[in-house]
Amino acid sequence: MHGCGNDFVVIDNRSQQLELHEDEIKLICDRHYGVGCDQLVVINSNNKKDISAHALFWNSDGSVSATCGNATRCIASILFKETETKTVNIETQNGVIECHKKNNQLVSVNIGKPKISWNEIPLSKDVSTL
């Protein structure tokens, strides 16, 4: 699927128990030897009230991403095709994201306020900011 210039491999895992490992994720995302994508997204079922689905996100290097706004819009689009509702809630590692169907081709998501303070942005290693 494509969302605002990003491309995703989306796996609907709601009716199965597929478990992917990092090497498999990297291979799927590889543009030369796999399908190729910016991120791999897995949609899982969810038994919580008012939650339509649970989503997991991986970057093409196999690392976990807590969420992705564009990928969440793609997942919401799939869910909207299955139901008449105009709002779905998708649970991610960053919490529940509320998604709205604006019309047949427009989906909006509320991913919250951006983190702009340097100490709120995760880094791969500790570094001095001075």
Where are the regions a protein language model picked out?
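A glycine-rich beta-to-alpha transition motif near the start of alpha/beta enzyme domains, typified by
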Residues: 1-103
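ATP-dependent small-molecule kinase catalytic core of the GHMP/sugar-kinase superfamily
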Residues: 84, 91-130
